[in-house]
Amino acid sequence: MAIRIKLKPGRERSLERRHPWVFSNGIHNVNGGKPQAGDTVDVVAHDGRWLGRGAWSPESQIQVRIWTFDKEEAIDADFFARRIQRAQAGREDLIREQGLTGYRLIAAESDGLPGITIDRYADVLVCQLLNTGAEKWRDTLVEQLALQFPGCAIYERSDVDSRKKEGLAPVQGLLHGELPAMPIIIEENGIKIAVDVVKGHKTGFYLDQRDNRAIAARFVKGKSVLNCFCYTGTFGLYAAKAGAASIENVDVSALALQTARDNMAINGLDDSHVNYHEADVFKLLRQYRDEGKTFDVIVLDPPKFADNKSQLNGACRGYKDINMIAMQLLNPGGILLTFSCSGLMESDLFQKVVADAALDAKREVQFVERMHQASDHPISSAFPEGYYLKGLVARVW
C-alpha cells in the first residue's frame, strides 16, 4: 500500500484545481510508513479522497510535488517516457517555424515534471534537477532521454543554490554520451548563437528571450542601441542584423563579451559599429547620465532581483532605479525594452514600477507592447508561478 499524506481540512482546494505543490503547513499526518526523500506518495484530503501522487521532499517547505492527478497512473519509466514525448510533440511546430536547434524541451511543472528542466542545444540535452523527486528518478530520466534522442549527449547543470532547500548538493557533469567541444552552435530565426553548456549561465543560454530578441529588432534600424546585461550579446546580434547604426554591449563578464564578439563573427556580421564594454551596468548608466550621453534604444535585461517575498520590496526599488536612469538616457521618442525574470514580480506590479520610474525620470512613457517568455516555456493554467519572465516595450518622450 502506498504511503498516504493526509491534508488538513480545507487544504485540498489547490490540488482540486490541479496546482502541483503541497506545503508542509497543510499536512495533517503521514500514514503507511516513513517516506524517504524522493519517494512516491499519495496525497489525500482530510476526508480520505484521493487527490494526487507525487514526490516527497522532507526538508523543503514544499513537501510534495505532484507528478500526476490520475489515480491509475503509476510513476515509472513509462510515465517519464510519456511526459517527454508529449513535451517534444508540443514543440514541433515551433521548431519548424523558427528553425530551432536550441529550445526548452521540459519546463518543469508546466510540462508535468516538477523540478525538471531540460534544454536542447543541437545534439546536447542539458538537465537541471532541482528537487528530491527529480534526483530520485535521474537514472530513469537519462535512460528515457537516450532512447528518445539517440545520438544526443546528456549533461547535467544542477549547480544551483535552490537545491540546498531540498537538502541536495550542487551537481554538474556528463550523464550520457560524449560532450562535443564548446561552444555548441545553435540556430534560431536564421541566427547562429554560440552556447557553452559547461561554463555558461543557467543551462548555457537564455532561450526564453528568443521572441523578445525578435521584437527588439523591429525598433533598431538606423538607431543607436545600448544593450545592458548583454551576456553573450544576442539582443545586440539581432540588432546588428536588423541594421542598427551603433550598438554598445555591456556586461560584467569578459568571457561573455568575448562570446558576443564570436557570435558576430559566426554570423558574418561586421562589428566595426559595435562596442563591447566590460562594466557594472548600474555604475555605467549613472556615469553616462552624468556625461549627458544618450541612445535611441536601450535593452535592460537584469538578473533576478527577488528570490523570495521578503526581497520583493527591495527588488521594486532596484527595478525602479535602473529604469529611471535608462529613461533619462533615451532620446525623445526612444524605445526602452525592460525585463524582470523574478517570478514574484507580477506583470501588473512590474508595469507600475516602470510607470513610477517614468514619474521620477520626469519623462512621458507609452507602453507599446508586453513581452513574456518564449512559447517553448509554456505556462500551465494550474501553475501561474510558471509565468516568470515579464517585459515591456516603452516609448519614452
Curated annotation (Swiss-Prot):
Tell me the enzyme class: transferase
Q: Give the enzyme's EC designation.
A: 2.1.1.191
One Pfam family here: Methyltrans_SAM
Indicate yes or no for the key word S-adenosyl-L-methionine. Answer: yes
Instruction: Enumerate the spans annotated as PUA domain.
Output: 2-80
* InterPro entries referenced in this protein's UniProt entry, alphabetically: PUA, PUA-like_sf, PUA_sf, RLMI, RlmI-like_PUA, SAM-dep_methyl-trfase, SAM-dependent_MTases_sf
Major subcellular site: cytoplasm
Catalytic activity field: cytidine(1962) in 23S rRNA + S-adenosyl-L-methionine = 5-methylcytidine(1962) in 23S rRNA + S-adenosyl-L-homocysteine + H(+)
Q: Where found, per UniProt?
A: Cytoplasm
Q: Per its UniProt entry, which superkingdom is the organism in?
A: Bacteria
Under the heading Gene3D superfamilies, the entry gives: PUA domain, RNA methyltransferase domain (HRMD) like, Vaccinia Virus protein VP39
Q: Which UniProt keywords apply?
A: Cytoplasm, Methyltransferase, RNA-binding, rRNA processing, S-adenosyl-L-methionine, Transferase
**Known HAMAP family for this protein?**
23SrRNA_methyltr_I
PANTHER family reported in the protein's UniProt record: RIBOSOMAL RNA LARGE SUBUNIT METHYLTRANSFERASE (PTHR42873), S-ADENOSYLMETHIONINE-DEPENDENT METHYLTRANSFERASE DOMAIN-CONTAINING PROTEIN (PTHR42873:SF1)
Role: Specifically methylates the cytosine at position 1962 (m5C1962) of 23S rRNA.
Q: Which family does it belong to?
A: Belongs to the methyltransferase superfamily. RlmI family.
> What is the protein named?
Ribosomal RNA large subunit methyltransferase I
Q: Which organism is it from?
A: Shewanella denitrificans (strain OS217 / ATCC BAA-1090 / DSM 15013)
